[in-house]
């Protein structure tokens, strides 16, 4: 029989004023791709320092650019001009991730709430489990 949970008072959540500041996570391709996705979903500019130049990062950048996110290299790092949580645009062409599985999976989640059609391609992707 499931245990019942009693909450003494209702829980509420308030809107945040936003985040600002600096964060230095360890260098990792997953963290870099996740940072790109979060920056794209945020509204406004984010500068990512120390982003890698590997296949995963390149695939994520190209996919985000195809959906209207401006990403450029500055003296401080990669500047990502995010479009907001539901601001991505429908890509005109198939998003090709080649063998970059991590950005493919994360991009699937990023576009899921959007109402546009999108097509994804990948080759030599590792098995998922």
Where are the language model's segments positioned?
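Short, structured segments at the rim of ligand-binding sites
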Residues: 1-129
């Amino acid at each position: 029989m499931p245990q019942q949970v009693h909450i003494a008072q209702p829980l509420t959540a308030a809107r945040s004023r936003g985040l600002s500041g600096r964060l230095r996570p360890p260098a990792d391709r997953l963290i870099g791709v996740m940072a790109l996705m979060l920056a794209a979903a945020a509204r406004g500019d984010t500068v990512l320092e120390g982003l890698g130049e590997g296949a995963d990062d390149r695939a994520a950048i190209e996919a985000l650019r195809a959906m209207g996110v401006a990403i450029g290299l500055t003296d401080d790092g990669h500047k990502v001009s995010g479009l907001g949580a539901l601001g991505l645009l429908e890509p005109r062409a198939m998003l090709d991730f080649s063998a970059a599985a991590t950005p493919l999976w994360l991009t699937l989640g990023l576009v899921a709430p959007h109402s546009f059609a999108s097509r994804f391609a990948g080759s030599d992707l590792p098995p998922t489990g």
